[in-house]
UniProtKB/Swiss-Prot annotation:
This is Biotin synthase auxiliary protein. Probably contains an unusual Fe-S cluster. It comes from Mycolicibacterium smegmatis (strain ATCC 700084 / mc(2)155) (Mycobacterium smegmatis). The lineage of its organism: Bacteria, Bacillati, Actinomycetota, Actinomycetes, Mycobacteriales. Disulfide bonds: none annotated. Its cofactor is iron-sulfur cluster. GO terms for molecular function: iron-sulfur cluster binding; metal ion binding. Keywords: Biotin biosynthesis, Iron, Iron-sulfur, Metal-binding. Belongs to the BsaP family. Disruption phenotype: The deletion mutant is unable to grow without extrabacterial biotin. The growth defect of the deletion mutant in biotin-free media can be complemented with biotin but not with another intermediate of the biotin synthesis pathway. The keyword Transferase does not apply.
């Protein structure tokens, strides 16, 4: 049986805004983001700048309206 993968949290899920630039969702991604070296900086739902903390083992980001997301929650191998 195939398990359904859970939806991404609102701050980094598919939304109206690009999580790296704050522009429209269909805008180009910065090179560092394409390589996976950049954490999301803007909420995908509302475009607000998020509070971001980078750690040696990942990052967390928090939108004042849509909550908290941690990179360890997004990695299915952990």
């Amino acid at each position: 049986m195939i398990e359904e993968t859970p939806a991404l949290p609102a701050p980094v899920g598919a939304g109206v805004y690009n999580v790296y630039t704050g522009g429209p969702a269909d805008s180009a991604l910065p090179t560092a983001a394409q390589l996976g070296l950049e954490p999301p900086r803007f909420c995908a739902e509302c475009g607000r700048r998020m509070i971001v903390q980078v750690r040696p083992d990942g990052w967390w980001a928090q939108c004042s309206r849509h909550g908290h997301v941690d990179s360890t929650d997004l990695d299915p191998r952990r």
